[in-house]
Each structure stands twice: as structure tokens, then as C-alpha cells.
């Protein structure tokens, strides 16, 4: 168990270094720091692009801390995957730091479905198992880039592009990813298109996808 724990910590350190690189200078999508830190003041009613700062004298070590990435997420769902997010909502000290982390667990044949991060580049590394990953570039080419990742492999999903990860192995898989924003956002393509509230008209979707409306209605019913 000690060896497994040490290995996990080493892998976590690698991802942390990648996260720092990802958030450095102009590469980060968030504004640069103007002070040492700006811990979120959760009691403030001020609304800004980001979050207001807590008084520095009230900041404690716990504002920069999160525990739980060693714990596997529950993958008993339709997609067979689970994302554990560590961004500014979990660590208020990440405010203005331009970086966050996620742990993604995958059951065999588990999928993190096609989605985008509108405010961040993502750099995942596989901790256990193997993953088939890919992203699609913008119009008009819509070219698909794919790769099979094994333990220790790293890949890059450029900011804003649709991407996915699929566990193509027979065992559980785990990945840890750094993102270049304190609040990357996520838009899951299927949920956005077929599960919006209120729903997008089936006439519009039928024309967009060049299928009958009854097919659109059946798909929307799944969301």
C-alpha cells in the first residue's frame, strides 16, 4: 500500500508541474495576479468577473487545501464515468491563480462524453488503465485527432475544442487533468443540444442533423 501511495503522489506531482506550466503567463486564460493571493470571500455580495478577495488577515491554510483526490469516484451511471472537480469552488485560494484539477474515473467501456471547456486548455495524464482520447478542430476541417493513452501518458485538449475520453480497456481507468483556469466551465455537447431548458425546437434540430423529427424527439427524451 505504501508503494502504491508513493506512486500516486509522484504522479500527482507531475500533474501539478504540468498545471503550473499550463497556467504560466499568457498561456493561462484567467487574468494575472496583482497580489500574492486573492482567496474568495464567500460572504461578499459583490459580483465581479471572478470573485472578491477575503481580507488577507482572515486567510488560513485551509483556504488552499482540498482532500479527496485519492478516492475513486462512483461510475455506476449511464456513461460509466465520474469527474471529481477541484477548482475555485472547492479551493477558494485558487481565485486568480488560473489553474484547477480534475480526477476522472472510468469503468470498463466508460466514457467522458464529448464536451468543451470554454475557458481552459486541459492536460490529462493516465494514472491507471488505458484511454482512447480525441478532440475535433473547428470548422471547416473538423479534423479528428485521436490517441490511445496508457499509464503515465499525457495529452493536450486545446481550449474550447470538443474532446472526449473512452476507457477501451477491460479494467477501471483513472486520469488526472490540469486545466488552465480557476473555473474552466464545461459544456457537454449532448446535454447542451438535446437537453437544454427549454428545449431547442425539434424542427431546428431535425434540420441541423438532417433527420426526422421523431428521431430528435427520441434522443431528447434521453436527456
Swiss-Prot record:
What is this protein for, i.e. what is its function?
A: May play a role in plant defense. Probably has no oxalate oxidase activity even if the active site is conserved.
Primary location: secreted
InterPro entries the record matches: Cupin_1 (IPR006045), Germin (IPR001929), Germin_Mn-BS (IPR019780), RmlC-like_jellyroll (IPR014710), RmlC_Cupin_sf (IPR011051)
Keyword Manganese on entry? yes
State the signal peptide span: 1-28
Q: What SMART domains does this protein's entry cite?
A: Cupin_1 (SM00835)
Binding-site residues, Mn(2+): 115, 117, 122, 163
Q: What is this protein called?
A: Putative germin-like protein 2-2
Give the record's glycosylation annotations as residue positions.
74, 82, 168
Per UniProt, subcellular location reads as:
Secreted, Extracellular space, Apoplast
TM stretches of this protein: none
- Its domain of life reads Eukaryota
Q: Which UniProt keywords apply?
A: Apoplast, Disulfide bond, Glycoprotein, Manganese, Metal-binding, Secreted, Signal
Q: How does it assemble?
A: Oligomer (believed to be a pentamer but probably hexamer).
Limits of the Cupin type-1 domain: 67-217
List, in alphabetical order, the Gene Ontology terms for molecular function in this entry: manganese ion binding
Entry-linked SUPFAM superfamilies: RmlC-like cupins
Q: Which cysteines are joined by disulfide bonds?
A: 38-53
Cellular component terms (Gene Ontology): apoplast
Protein family according to the UniProt entry: Belongs to the germin family.
Amino acid at each position: 500500500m505504501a508503494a502504491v501511495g508513493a506512486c500516486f503522489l509522484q504522479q500527482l506531482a507531475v500533474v501539478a508541474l504540468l498545471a503550473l506550466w499550463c497556467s504560466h503567463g499568457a498561456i493561462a486564460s484567467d487574468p494575472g495576479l496583482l497580489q500574492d493571493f486573492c482567496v474568495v470571500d464567500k460572504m461578499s455580495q459583490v459580483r465581479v468577473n471572478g470573485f472578491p478577495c477575503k481580507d488577507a488577515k482572515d486567510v488560513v491554510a485551509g483556504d488552499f487545501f482540498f482532500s479527496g483526490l485519492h478516492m475513486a469516484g462512483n461510475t455506476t451511471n449511464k456513461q460509466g464515468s465520474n469527474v471529481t472537480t477541484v477548482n475555485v469552488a472547492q479551493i477558494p485560494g485558487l481565485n486568480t491563480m488560473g489553474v484547477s484539477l480534475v480526477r476522472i474515473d472510468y469503468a470498463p467501456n466508460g466514457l467522458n462524453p464529448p464536451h468543451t471547456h470554454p475557458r481552459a486548455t486541459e492536460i490529462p495524464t493516465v494514472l491507471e488503465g488505458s484511454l482512447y482520447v480525441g478532440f475535433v478542430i473547428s470548422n471547416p476541417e473538423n479534423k479528428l485527432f485521436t490517441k490511445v493513452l496508457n499509464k503515465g501518458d499525457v495529452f493536450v485538449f486545446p481550449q474550447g475544442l470538443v474532446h472526449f475520453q473512452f476507457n477501451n480497456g477491460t479494467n477501471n481507468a483513472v486520469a488526472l487533468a490540469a486545466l488552465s483556469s480557476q473555473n474552466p466551465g464545461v459544456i457537454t455537447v449532448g446535454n447542451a443540444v438535446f437537453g437544454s431548458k427549454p428545449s431547442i425546437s425539434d424542427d431546428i434540430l431535425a434540420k441541423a442533423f438532417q433527420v426526422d423529427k421523431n428521431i430528435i424527439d427520441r434522443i431528447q427524451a434521453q436527456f
